[in-house]
Structures are given as structure tokens and as C-alpha cells.
Amino acid sequence: MSNLRFACVALLLGGSLAVAAAQNAPSPPQPPAPPQQHIKIAFVQIDGDPRYEPVRGYTRTILKTPEHPYTGAEIGIDEAAPLTRLLNTDFTLDRISVKSPAEVAPAVLAAADAGTQFFLIDAPAEAYQALVTALHGRDVLLFNVSAPDDTLRRDLCSVEMIHVYPSRAQLMDGLVQYLVSRKWSNLLVFEGPTPEDSAMAAAFSHSAQKFGAHIVADQHFKPGTDPRDREQNEPALLSAINRDFDVVVVADSEFDFVRSVPYHLVRPRPVVGSIDLEPVAWHWTWERNGAPQVNSRFEKKAGGHHMEGPDWAAWIAVKMIVQSALRTHSADFAMQRAFILGDNDFDGDKGLAVSVRPWDHQVRQAVLLAAPYEVVGSAPIEGFLHQTNDLDTLGDDQPEARCHLNK
């Protein structure tokens, strides 16, 4: 019996010693943590860009205070913060300011040489030819967040560019779809003297022809109060034509003459284009698809300033970059680029998902039809159908496009 007891005690002691030895044994080496990855995004703007000068009335009263859309990019970065640990990736945003359009290309080239591969470009059209020439063949993506010019999509045709901001063709197609859907098909156009006015009027004319609307007259106005120019600067006289019309469409990039058009026509007609009902990429009164949350975050960050089209474009550009890293589980530029340019959708909080057209790198997106304090509609309007994607009823569809990057 004593021998049995001794054996049991020995067994217990042996087990305890084995456990203690196991506890005191050094842990096996852990694999090293993967290095933190970094995705750098640069926002490039021009100080003194005339597009962001305060818009003043005749007595120098400030009517509009447009701002660079940097805050839109910032809220995109803020939204990415929870993903930093999950992806083991830092997203950083640098702001690059230059003094003229000619300085954009050298600044972007220098940043690319320093390792930045994603650029949000807030510049007018004249900056882009030198930019795409300097960056051609580089591992970069240049996101146009504020220039609507159709020539950038049709003639520049760069594989490095993504046009996040809607083209004039998209905006005017959205407006005309709405007018035609309301059976307002006879249109009187007031066209201003600037190149921007001419471009807007030309885009509108193309859209009217595309969707079966009829321009009854194109009246050229001359801003000012000179009584000798009354026939060109008074809406009542400009609208006194011998044909009826349903709507007056005004192309006035300087927001000067257009303010006198509503309620000063010879017939009581709606006014659209540069005032009252405008086709826009975004509007602060949009209340669907998560828009109130986006607007709230933006206004808090911007000190109460309302979110506008370029702000939305900067925000969704950052979101596309972040989502490409999340959904590919990679910070590799080639993989991200392929995902962004592939047949993939992104939620732009405008209802229909946004994506990049392969033929001209224009982002497909809804166009909001906005009155001053309400979004009255969203294009594509119901009934305007496309064989593959109804968003391709807005802007240059592949068969009519001059740019074919996918060939």
C-alpha cells in the first residue's frame, strides 16, 4: 500500500514539475508584424484661382463665396480613419498650393517623384495639357474634381486622368431630360459673352437635339446697365419674340445678368440653367441616400459652409481610393488602379452607384436638379433608358465618344 501511495505522489509531482517547466519555457518566436503601409493623397489647388473669387453684385454686395473643395477631401480622410488599423494602412492628405495654372504640372511631378501616386486636381482646364504631358506613363492617377470642360474628356483623353466632376454634357443632359419629362420642350436661350457661357450654351444645344427639345431662339445678352444696350441687357426685350416658349435657359457664368431674369420676362415662364433650377453634382438640400449625414459632417468641418459639387467630387475621389485599398486588401498602386478603373461600383450617396467609364474615364453619376432650397429631381429621369446603364444617358456614351481609352 505504501508503495502504491509513493508511486501516486511521484506521479503527481512529476506532472506538476512538467507543467511548471512548460510554463517557464520560452515562447516560440512570433512572426514580425507586417510593416505599416502608407497611401499618400495630394490635393492640388491654385491660389487666386478666379473661380473661387467672391461673386459680387452691382453695388459690390457679396452674393456667393465659393471655396476650394479641400474640405470634401478632408472628410473622406476622416471617414477612412477607422480602417487604418484594419488595413494596417495610413491614409494621408497633403495640400499643395501653386500660384498659376502653369505651376500645376511641375508641382505634381515633384510630388510624384517623392512617392505620391494619387492626386486631386482643383484647377481650370488650361492647366491640364501640360499636366497630362508631364505625367504620361507615370504610376499616378489624377482626379479632376472641379473642371466641367467637355474638351478634357473628348480631346485630352489621358489614361492617367479620372474625371470625377461631371462634364458639361452630363449636366446639360440631366437638365434637358427633366425639361422634356415635364413637356417643356420649347426653349428660349439667353447666352452670355464669356467662353464659359458659350461652352454651356453649346452643351445645352447638343442636349436639346439629343433628347428632342427645340430651341426657339438663342439671344445673346450683354451685361451692364448702359441704356444704349437696352435690347441686349433687358430680359423683357430679349424675351419679346414672336414665338412662344416654355422655359428660359440662361448661360451666365458670371452670375450677373441672370439675377434680373426671373419675374422680368414678357411671359411668366420658369428660368433654368445658371439660376433657379440648376443641374449640379451635389446640393446641400439633398435628403436621400445618406446625404444628410454627409452634409452634416461637411458643414461641421467647414464651419457651416454648404457642400457643393466640387466638394462632393473631392470626397468621392478619396472614397474611391480608400475603397480600392479595402476591397483589394492591398496598398499596391497597380491593384488599386485596376480596381478603380474596373467594372466596380462606389456609393456616392446619390442613389445610383458611381463608376468609371472605360472609354473616357468620366465617372458615371446622377445629376441633381436643384432649386435654391430644394432638389426637385435627379437624372437620369425615369423613362430615359440605356441598354446597359441608365447613367450612360448622361454625357458622352461610348458610340458617340471621341475618346476611346479602352481600345
Feature-to-residue mapping (PLM):
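Extracytosolic ligand-binding ectodomains
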Residues: 2-9, 21-407
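C-terminal segment of classical bacterial N-terminal signal peptides
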Residues: 14-21
